[in-house]
């Protein structure tokens, strides 16, 4: 007669549970109905993709239609390539506090709908990012309940890429096709297998 639960099964269960705990994907949390106009965008460039170069600034802004000056806090979490929380401690990827209050807010006046507008710039006097990677920005209320999350990317340019576009040398395709050539200058960055890594 077989044992219903052996030491081997117990070890396998513990191992699987530990993988589940350490590889939890941080979900994108949708904001409640009173939170509107959420934007997370770079401050220097004129596009809305939340992607910045290491050392550049990104800004979060949103409106709370309750209009009652809530005490919101933010937390920045470093993630791996698959948006799983990384095992890196905050002191390795941040200078300053990983959580703090959102201190910049203004109440609307002379408007049909009352609201409070909140803004957060990163870096700020209390925090700066010192490591490239994927990040989750969490916003919580004064009861530490998660209100919403936003993802952003911080990158470090390690190679330069040049591109040139030329008309096709084939006469039949001269007006409809192009040749595109890329040049990757790796500098001191080591690439072992260009076919897979570029």
Listing of model-derived features with the role each one plays in the protein:
Residues 1-25:
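Bacterial Sec-dependent N-terminal signal peptides
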Residues 26-40, 159:
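Proline/serine/threonine-rich low-complexity linkers at boundaries of modular beta-sandwich domains
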Residues 81-83, 127, 141-147:
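Short acidic/polar inter-strand loop motif in beta-rich domains
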Residues 66-70, 128-129, 189-196:
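A short beta-turn/strand-edge loop motif at beta-sheet boundaries
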Residues 95-115:
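Extended, solvent-exposed segments with strong compositional bias
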Residues 36-78, 172-186:
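Contiguous beta-strand segments within globular domains
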Residues 154-177:
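Low-complexity, Pro/Ser/Thr- and charge-rich linker/hinge segments at domain boundaries
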Residues 114-127, 132-139:
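Ligand-binding face of N-terminal immunoglobulin V-set domains in extracellular IgSF glycoproteins
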């Amino acid at each position: 007669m077989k044992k219903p639960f052996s030491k081997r099964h117990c070890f396998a269960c513990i191992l699987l549970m530990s993988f589940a705990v350490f590889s939890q994907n941080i979900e994108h949390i949708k904001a409640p109905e009173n939170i509107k106009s959420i934007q997370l965008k770079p401050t220097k460039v004129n596009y809305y993709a939340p992607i910045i170069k290491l050392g550049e600034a990104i800004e979060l802004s949103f409106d709370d239609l309750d209009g009652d000056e809530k005490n919101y806090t933010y937390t920045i979490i470093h993630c791996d390539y698959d948006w799983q929380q990384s095992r890196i401690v905050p002191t390795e990827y941040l200078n300053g506090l990983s959580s703090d209050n959102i201190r910049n807010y203004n109440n609307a006046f002379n408007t049909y709908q009352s609201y409070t507008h909140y803004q957060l710039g990163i870096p700020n006097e209390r925090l700066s990012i010192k490591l490239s990677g994927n990040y989750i920005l969490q916003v919580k209320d004064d009861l530490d309940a998660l209100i919403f999350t936003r993802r952003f990317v911080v990158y470090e340019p390690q190679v330069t890429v040049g591109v040139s576009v030329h008309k096709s040398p084939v006469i039949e395709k001269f007006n409809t096709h192009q040749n595109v050539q890329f040049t990757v200058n790796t500098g001191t960055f080591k690439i072992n297998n260009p076919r897979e890594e570029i």
